[in-house]
Each structure stands twice: as C-alpha cells, then as structure tokens.
From Swiss-Prot:
Active site as annotated: H20
Binding site for tRNA: Y15, F66, N68, N114
UniProt-annotated site: Stabilizes the basic form of H active site to accept a proton, residues: D93
Gene3D superfamilies for the chain: Peptidyl-tRNA hydrolase
Source organism of the structure: Cupriavidus metallidurans (strain ATCC 43123 / DSM 2839 / NBRC 102507 / CH34)
Cellular compartments annotated: Cytoplasm
Originating gene: pth
Reaction(s) the record says it catalyses: an N-acyl-L-alpha-aminoacyl-tRNA + H2O = an N-acyl-L-amino acid + a tRNA + H(+)
Biological processes per GO annotation: protein quality control for misfolded or incompletely synthesized proteins; rescue of stalled ribosome
Protein name: Peptidyl-tRNA hydrolase
Length: 198
C-alpha cells in the first residue's frame, strides 16, 4: 500500500519548466485529480496535501529544499505520519530513459541522482519505490553534447523541447493507472502495467 507520493524538483519559477522538475509535474497532476491544493508545510520543508486517490487517502509532497536536500522533507512527513519506506513512491527525472518512457522499481542505488541519494541517507534505507520519468540524455539530444557533468547539469536545468515535453506529459498520464494498482498493494501487476502497457 502506498501512503506518500513525493515529486522531486527544484522550487522557484525559474526551475518550474525544467527537466529536473518532472517529479513535480507528476505530483501536480495527482493533486489536480484528487482535487487537492498543496500548501506550504514548514514542518515538512515543502508543499504537501492529502488527496483522495484510488479510493484511499494519499499524501502528496513537493520538497522545497532543492533537489539535493530532499531527504529532510521526505523523512519529516514520513515520520510524522508513521509512513514506512516501502509505502513511499519518489517520482523523479531519469536521464537514462528516453523522454516519453517511465519505469517503476523498488529499492536500488541512486543512479547518480542526488535527490535519491539524500532521501536514502535520511530514511537510512534504499527500500522505497521510485518512479523514473524519462527525460533523455544530452548525448542523445540533437547536436548532443558529450554528456560530461557540466553538460548533464545544463541539460536537466533547461526546459525540454516541445516534442519532448509532449512525450513526458504522455508518460506521466500513463503512470496514473499503475500508481493506483501499486497503491492497492499489487506491485507486480503495477510494474507490468507500466512497463508493458497491459
């Protein structure tokens, strides 16, 4: 059962439309579906709200600590409401997946994602769900860069091209059903639905 869905991103208008905020976009979509307005919750270091989704109450959270410090926000809300790590889904941008794809997995390393690294450190476990939203990689972009650290930072902190944005939005829409399946406790089925479309 899933009790908390966290979207990773950076706060502020200048970051709103950047690839690094794909997790925020998913949580915004869920908030609209659940008829919930996320409000500033200083004790949780972010914007939070309780939504009625898939016939159950689910907390939605957008940390306002900037990506690399997301763990403080996640652990604050999880501890307050006694939510276990395996009841948490963290949605984040994933450069190793093309724009328009999404993958669901439980546990594993951070894959170089500093937001996940910080969350794992604060939760003292990697045993939480990750919803990886593909945003592509600079080496695969038209006129693509080599993909060094500076190229990667520039890439994720820029808005996607129009066709990429459309593909990412469609991927987010495709995540909603499988997230509902996961929230009901059917993890294998949720992964199959998302990964195979069945």
């Amino acid at each position: 059962m899933i009790k908390l869905i966290v979207g990773l991103g950076n706060p502020g208008a200048e970051y709103e439309a950047t690839r690094h905020n794909a997790g925020f976009w998913l949580v915004d979509q869920l908030a609209r579906m659940g008829g919930t307005t996320l409000r500033v919750e200083s004790r949780f270091h972010g914007l939070a709200g309780r939504a009625r989704l898939w016939d159950q109450d689910v907390w939605l959270l957008k940390p306002s600590t900037f990506m690399n410090r997301s763990g403080l926000s996640v652990v604050s809300l999880a501890r307050f409401y006694k939510i276990l790590p395996d009841e948490i889904v963290v949605a984040h941008d994933e450069m190793d997946l093309p724009a328009g794809s999404a993958k669901l997995k439980r546990g594993g390393g951070s894959g170089g994602h500093n937001g996940l690294k910080d969350i794992s450190a604060h939760l003292t476990t990697q045993d939480y769900w990750r919803l990886r939203i593909g945003v592509g990689h600079p080496r695969n972009a038209p006129g693509g860069a080599a993909g060094g650290r500076e190229d990667v930072v520039n890439f994720v902190l820029k808005p996607p091209r129009k066709e990429e944005q459309q593909a990412i939005d469609e991927a987010i829409d495709r995540c909603i059903g499988p997230l509902g399946t996961l929230a009901r406790g059917e993890s294998e089925r949720a992964m199959m639905e998302l990964h195979t479309g069945r």
